[in-house]
């Protein structure tokens, strides 16, 4: 018997952002420098790879201003952004172009000159954390949380395209835990991995064989570098130590604990004569490899250090990437200028050799807090600069800025006593708002046209937020249904900005396809959407079909003040979107107006006694409706009454009282 493959659940996500994002929005995870072009490459938690000019120390051209003396802040260095990842960019290497590794589980090959993704490798099944490049043999190794290392031939990768990206790869197996670091020498004779297993594993990539394990660390190995001939390596660990190893002797030659916390980043010079280290304690140390007992404190960053990039040329620099969104360049003194003597201030703190960077590439603030308002359409956020803003999910854009105003005040000012079910989720991992729509609850947000802010539409018209948003996200797609009348629940009252990234992904977050929504009009993207768009999206976008309203049972009883001993208890069922006004009309027409007598059989005054049988618009002047002894607003819907007033399980109990 052949098993029927289970079709994976597909979600739809989009990111609310500016059209151009020239600055990193969150922490910077990786750096690479191209000495031939003088360009710096950076990858960040905001999913974007950026390319920067790296000016010479004497180059004062461009827009810059000073901070704290000699530091120049340059806002004119951004050259290009490369976007196609959907999660953190964890590592990049420069070869024929750029190869990147991401927490979206993919490895991507880029044309750096034109700035586009040539192909996507989906071999890894979990976060891809590290890359290593063997320059002389044109090989790249990738490792991640799936405990596997894959070897890639660069010549093969450069021939791949977005539609033809099938490639054969070899793998190195044996790791028992998530891989956080990788290193290889230029000739590709060894590949070394560090992981949460607390050991270094050494492989021969030519034969795809394990060679040895190097034991000694007591925590995760976060960084590894290896010398040119593959005989020595240096590792950095969350245990706070850096260790020098002999691969031939399979032992630790020396260990140094100059850092007070985890060590995350290493860089060695071209001669493998000194190593620079940085980590959680924000301090960058320089250690001579032939004297692995002492380290000089070079400088102190203002946030934990994630990556270092040494520029080992005539003008020596080191670039730093931290938890902050800015990137800094620190000028390095010559070896002769570095004092072996450790100097301390009056409090006993070690004085760094370099007091400030000479150049800063500024970053932008990232969103760190959010609250979805109870209208389930607007979101209030606070960023790392304490700026508060409000966003409209339906329009995919910012509504207004509130500056440094307390977030709680803004939320209170925009509170509405209306209940709308949750129909999307919010993720801030990129420092920007990412909205995810799931089949299970996406269609649950039915609201009246009035509550949705469309006063010109008939009050009885019901709007489906999910359907409206889907139509806006896919409006450029050729298969999108366009003949929608004004009172349709998915009528396109607004459009989402064309630059908005749209992502189809599995429920695990693993991406299937990413594009800018305006590009859905292009033939290639349109065809790929046809291959990947799930049926629940097609129902709305292509066929304009929506699920029916949810039904809500409730009881109607005469108010206790009427003194009826054996009241009739009517159990009714209606859409949860039904307004209280409609229930009042039902009471007036069907329950109170039973005959023309002065009093009906149950002792309640008949409607005919009060006024003519024809129902007037002001029903609130004829009937009152109560729940939990609270008089109900005729404009409320049953869903809101149950959420804000009934506040318990079981069927809703409503009590009517005629106005005498």
Curated annotation (Swiss-Prot):
Chain's role: Regulator of deubiquitinating complexes. Activates deubiquitination by increasing the catalytic turnover without increasing the affinity of deubiquitinating enzymes for the substrate.
Positions of WD repeats: 23-78, 84-120, 123-162, 174-213, 216-255, 258-297, 300-341, 362-401
GO MF term (any one): ubiquitin binding
Organism: Brugia malayi
One BP annotation, GO: double-strand break repair via homologous recombination
Highest taxon listed in the record's lineage: Eukaryota
Pfam family, one: WD40
Keyword terms of this UniProt record: Repeat, Ubl conjugation pathway, WD repeat
InterPro entries: G-protein_beta_WD-40_rep, WD40/YVTN_repeat-like_dom_sf, WD40_repeat_CS, WD40_repeat_dom_sf, WD40_rpt, WDR48, WDR48/Bun107
Protein name (Swiss-Prot/TrEMBL): WD repeat-containing protein 48 homolog
Family: Belongs to the WD repeat WDR48 family.
